[in-house]
């Protein structure tokens, strides 16, 4: 099995378990416990599902962490021997919030050409896919792309900065914690909807995925990675303040520790290996012609090593 593993994550507390894994060297610990004491672990950070998918396809990393939408697109693209990408576990259920600083925008129906919506990657990011699902819910499947022309690709921290500045063309932001929390403290910014409204309940936002070749050739390494993720989840649950301290130490973000603890402890946020509501996203992407292959259940998107989880 390999003696080095490279992982990429993105921005926000929906990646918190991975930040904890890096800081606490949990993969190294779990690998050592499995007879691999010299495991080298390298972490990178990118923005948007497209870029983490490209990193995996280019063999620049062994594991990518990204939204359920980008996973499904990659699963579809790499099926039948072209990499056969699947998820090894879920990372987080975190609501994404669509915010606006245009007082005229109370619901999706109020968006017009006067609005520009920042999100991590147009068309492909989980925010973009959820916006399409919301549009399809409101206007029918044929109109799922109705709001796409208003969207702009932008890193969450930059989108938040634009919203809070009150300047520039960006007057809406589809984001997640901690950025939505920070923005909503500004009285000029309000919530239009969140992803749990669209999915009808909690939904996994982030999953961890790799190729079949890597997964099958390195079962002990994969076991160590998933065990490390599980350990991180336990630490977050047992000690949210410690998790918040780790997040701030690694990311150097400017959120207050108390705000972070409140977010991490929110009943709407869950860090666990079992996925929630991933299958409806696969159905939507297939129905709207974005992916060719039809998943028959959430298990199609995950390696058999994850099938014992009580997922959806």
Can you say where each PLM-predicted feature lies in the sequence?
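Small-molecule pocket liners
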Residues: 16, 92-98, 189-190, 204-208, ...
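Short, surface-exposed acidic
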Residues: 36-41, 142-149, 251-263, 292-298
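Short, glycine-/small- and polar/acidic-enriched structural segments
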Residues: 1-144, 149-153, 167, 171-177, ...
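Stable alpha-helical elements in mature extracytoplasmic
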Residues: 14, 23, 48, 52, ...
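Conserved C-terminal helix/tail region of periplasmic/extracytoplasmic solute-binding proteins
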Residues: 285-312
């Amino acid at each position: 099995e390999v003696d080095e593993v490279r992982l990429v994550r993105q921005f926000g507390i929906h990646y918190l378990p991975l930040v904890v894994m890096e800081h606490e060297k949990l993969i190294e610990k779990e690998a050592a416990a499995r007879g691999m004491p010299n495991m080298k672990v390298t972490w990178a950070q990118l923005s948007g599902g497209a870029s983490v998918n490209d990193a995996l396809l280019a063999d620049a990393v062994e594991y990518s962490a990204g939204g359920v939408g980008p996973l499904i697109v990659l699963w579809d693209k790499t099926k039948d021997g072209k990499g056969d990408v699947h998820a090894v576990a879920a990372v987080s259920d975190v609501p994404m919030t669509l915010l606006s600083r245009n007082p005229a925008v109370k619901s999706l129906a109020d968006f017009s050409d006067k609005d520009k919506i920042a999100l991590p990657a147009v068309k492909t990011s989980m925010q973009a896919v959820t916006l399409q699902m919301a549009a399809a819910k409101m206007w029918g499947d044929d109109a799922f792309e109705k709001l796409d022309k208003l969207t702009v690709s932008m890193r969450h921290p930059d989108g938040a900065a634009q919203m809070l500045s009150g300047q520039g063309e960006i007057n809406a932001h589809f984001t997640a914690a901690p950025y939505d929390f920070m923005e909503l403290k500004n009285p000029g910014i309000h919530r239009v909807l969140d992803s749990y409204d669209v999915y009808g309940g909690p939904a996994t936002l982030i999953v961890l995925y790799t190729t079949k070749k890597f997964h099958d050739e390195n079962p002990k390494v994969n076991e160590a990675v998933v065990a490390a993720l599980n350990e991180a989840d336990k630490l977050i649950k047992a000690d949210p303040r410690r998790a918040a301290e780790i997040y701030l130490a690694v990311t150097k973000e400017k959120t207050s520790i108390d705000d972070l603890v409140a977010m991490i402890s929110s009943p709407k946020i869950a860090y666990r290996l079992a996925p929630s509501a991933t299958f409806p996203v696969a159905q939507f992407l297939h129905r709207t012609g974005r992916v060719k292959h039809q998943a028959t259940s959430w298990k199609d998107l995950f390696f058999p090593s994850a099938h014992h989880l009580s997922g959806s």
